């Protein structure tokens, strides 16, 4: 299985548009939520894109939540680590999209 690869979806942290998916060899995979500089076709520039993987601790719903509540700065970098951001939102009484997955 040396050729086995996993595909990740990437979403632009500036505009939220889905970017081009990237296949990575299993041993070279990054954690879900990883930020990668990619060219965004909608923005017309290189921006940070969040790596989303279904059935992990960070998928599209988590990205949209993080973007909606402003955890990315003007350079599309995270203001708070995602775990800290998630706990902050929970403590503020915000309805978390992953609560149904029992992560808290």
Residue ranges and their predicted role:
Residues 5-11, 33-36:
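Short metal-coordination and nucleic-acid-contact micro-motifs, chiefly zinc-binding Cys/His arrays
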Residues 1-9, 27, 50-104:
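Short, intrinsically disordered terminal segments enriched in charged and Pro/Gly residues
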Residues 12-15, 40-43:
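Short cysteine-rich clusters marking metal-coordination/redox-active sites
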Residues 33-34, 43-44, 60-63:
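Short, surface-exposed linear patches
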Residues 17-19, 47:
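Cys/His-rich microdomains that often coordinate metals
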Residues 42-47, 52:
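Intrinsically disordered, low-complexity glycine/proline-rich and charged
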Residues 25-37:
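Short linker/helix segments within small regulatory modules
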